[in-house]
C-alpha cells in the first residue's frame, strides 16, 4: 500500500498539498502516482510568477512509461519551482513527499479545505 501522510491534502489527480506556516502551499505528486509512473526521467515545472487556475495543467512529469500532466490544486500564483527536482527527477521516486514540485500562493486560502483528506484520497484511488 502506498504511503499517504495524514497531514497533507490530496487531489483526485494524485497531487499532494501541504499548507505552510505562511499560508503558501507546497505541491508534489503522491507516492501512488510515482509508483504508477515508474522511473521519472524529466520534469517540466511552471515558471515563478505564473497565475494558475484550479484544475489547470501546469507541469509535466515524464517517466520511462508515460508523460503525465500535473494540475494546479488551487488557483493562485506560482511562487517557486523546485530546481533540485528538475535536475534530479529520480528524487521524486525516492521520496515523493520530500521532492516537492512547486509552491503556490493561493488566491483563496479556503480552497484547500475542499481538497481530499488522506482517507478520502485512499478511498478514491483504491490505495
Curated annotation (Swiss-Prot):
The keyword tRNA processing does not apply. Its cofactor is (R)-lipoate. One of its GO terms (biological process) is glycine decarboxylation via glycine cleavage system. Residues 24-105 form the Lipoyl-binding domain. The keyword Endoplasmic reticulum does not apply. GO terms for cellular component: cytosol; glycine cleavage complex. Binds 1 lipoyl cofactor covalently. Keywords: Lipoyl. It comes from the Bacteria. InterPro entries: 2-oxoA_DH_lipoyl-BS (IPR003016), Biotin_lipoyl (IPR000089), GCV_H (IPR002930), GCV_H/Fam206 (IPR033753), GCV_H_sub (IPR017453), Single_hybrid_motif (IPR011053). The modification N6-lipoyllysine is found at residue 65. The glycine cleavage system catalyzes the degradation of glycine. The H protein shuttles the methylamine group of glycine from the P protein to the T protein. The glycine cleavage system is composed of four proteins: P, T, L and H. Belongs to the GcvH family. This is Glycine cleavage system H protein. The gene is gcvH.
Amino acid at each position: 500500500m502506498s504511503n499517504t501522510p495524514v497531514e497533507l491534502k490530496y487531489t483526485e489527480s494524485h497531487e499532494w498539498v501541504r499548507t505552510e506556516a505562511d499560508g503558501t502551499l507546497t505541491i508534489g505528486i503522491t507516492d501512488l502516482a510515482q509508483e504508477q509512473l515508474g522511473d521519472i526521467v524529466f520534469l517540466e515545472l511552471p515558471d515563478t510568477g505564473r497565475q494558475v487556475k484550479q484544475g489547470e495543467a501546469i507541469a509535466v512529469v515524464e517517466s520511462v512509461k508515460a508523460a503525465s500532466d500535473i494540475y494546479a490544486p488551487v488557483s493562485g500564483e506560482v511562487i517557486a519551482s523546485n530546481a533540485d527536482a528538475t535536475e534530479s527527477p529520480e528524487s521524486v521516486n525516492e521520496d515523493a513527499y520530500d521532492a516537492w514540485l512547486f509552491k503556490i500562493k493561493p488566491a483563496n486560502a479556503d480552497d484547500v479545505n475542499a481538497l481530499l483528506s488522506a482517507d478520502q484520497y485512499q478511498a478514491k484511488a483504491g490505495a
